[in-house]
Amino acid sequence: MSKMNGPLRVGIGGPVGAGKTTLTAALSEALRDSHSIGVITNDIYTREDAEALMRLQILPQDRIIGVETGGCPHTAIREDASINLAAVAEMERRHPGIEIILIESGGDNLSATFSPELADVTLYVIDVAAGEEIPRKGGPAITKSDILIINKTDLAPHVGASLEVMERDAGRMRCGRPFVFSSLRNRDGVAEIVKLLAEIAGLEIRSDLQVANLA
């Protein structure tokens, strides 16, 4: 459902290659049948992520807007979110009554956060292959995001990462905030993420939600 003052805006952040676009695609796929949904992607100099989503054909092309941020990608989601707010307004113009807009940031570091003016709920994706120490390094994105997604769990045995250590450290750093282990390319963990998002944002989702494997 949309908010009283417009659609629910979900910020999706994380380092380059962590799985943001895969998460955006999976959430779009899971929510498109029950909600009017759109996507805004941020890239520094291209619209590669938007084009990747269009190729997947999960949403019609007019429901995907690519933003070229230039410079530091965190600026466009935090200090000066005007370019993204303009994209939100354009999405609302195209689709009056749109209920959910997913806003995918450009790749950034652990200090990246979304401006409250831009995002109502924030999801942050990290990659097991980047090292089991990532959760304990902290930073606002790790500690304050509404949902932390620890992605690519299937790679843990190959990179020597301990999921038990990551679970312990994530629990300690997040002080009760939820986190999910996932293998997003296989759609493992997506249903749990959708359920948590629904609880946090007050969304109604189908009890028979099925998430396909699009790997």
From Swiss-Prot:
GO terms for biological process: urea catabolic process. The keyword Nucleotide-binding applies. GO terms for molecular function: GTP binding; GTPase activity; nickel cation binding. It comes from the Bacteria. InterPro entries: CobW/HypB/UreG_nucleotide-bd, P-loop_NTPase, UreG. Keywords: Chaperone, Cytoplasm, GTP-binding, Nickel insertion, Nucleotide-binding. GTP binds at residues 14-21. It holds the Pfam family cobW. One of its GO terms (cellular component) is cytoplasm. It is found in: Cytoplasm. The keyword GTP-binding applies. SUPFAM superfamilies: P-loop containing nucleoside triphosphate hydrolases. Homodimer. UreD, UreF and UreG form a complex that acts as a GTP-hydrolysis-dependent molecular chaperone, activating the urease apoprotein by helping to assemble the nickel containing metallocenter of UreC. The UreE protein probably delivers the nickel. Facilitates the functional incorporation of the urease nickel metallocenter. This process requires GTP hydrolysis, probably effectuated by UreG. Belongs to the SIMIBI class G3E GTPase family. UreG subfamily. This is Urease accessory protein UreG. The gene is ureG.
